[in-house]
Curated annotation (Swiss-Prot):
Keywords: Cell membrane, Lipoprotein, Membrane, Palmitate, Signal. A lipid is attached at residue 23 (N-palmitoyl cysteine). GO terms for cellular component: plasma membrane. It comes from Staphylococcus aureus (strain MSSA476). The lineage of its organism: Bacteria, Bacillati, Bacillota, Bacilli, Bacillales. It comes from the Bacteria. InterPro entries: Csa (IPR007595), Csa_sf (IPR038641). A lipid is attached at residue 23 (S-diacylglycerol cysteine). This is Uncharacterized lipoprotein SAS2375. It is a lipid-anchor. Its main location: membrane. It is found in: Cell membrane.
Amino acid sequence: MIHSKRLRLWLYLVLLAVFISACGMKEDKQIKENFNKTLSLYPTKNLDDFYDKEGFRDQEFEKGDKGTWIVDSEMVVELKDKKMESRSMVLYINRNTRTTKGNFIVRELWEDSKGYAQSKDTKYPVKMEHNRIIPTKPIADDKLRKEIENFKFFVQYGDFKDINDYKDGDISYNPNVPSYSAEYQLSNNDYNVKQLRKRYDIPTKKAPKLLIKGDGDLKGSSIGHKNLEFTFVENKEENIYFTDSINFKPTK
């Protein structure tokens, strides 16, 4: 009798483990499929193409609203005993008016003598015409103006055609938020890492980890967000990382 109860308990635990494993595999598959939809946008070399790209639509969109694509790329560098500085650009690609506006942003963060966090943001308004970034206000600094005019978003040169070859990925899912992510250790020979090093002065030889993360319904949501993060260094004294996002939202 005792042996029979133990056998039933053992079978129950085995079935429970199989069920949990199957659910986990299903979630992993859904997460990868969800990310692949976003990653398929890379590369979109001509940003004007977003005027004709349809994104996920739900009840948050008003009737007749074609939506707005929001693209954002940012490089952040914080070295030991130095200010954290980030340089980024965000564009709002309005499919209704077929016009694009945004900002190039230089941000500095530091601690004052009392240990309080301080920050300073400097924004330079821009527009996009025929895949060209154009400052909408005069910029006296020629070097800065050229940096803005020559800026390229990661979506214009990033490529994830080999994403399925990435190994040892750490897939996680939190149904309570809900949020989900996939993390991979990359090498310096990775195509996207080479492209980032080509375009930015990245003061480390360490290969980055790639974190792809999102929140909202796995089946799709205009409320949720997705973004990529290449983290080269992350500790209490230094931080070096690059982030990129492409999101489709109702037009405001």
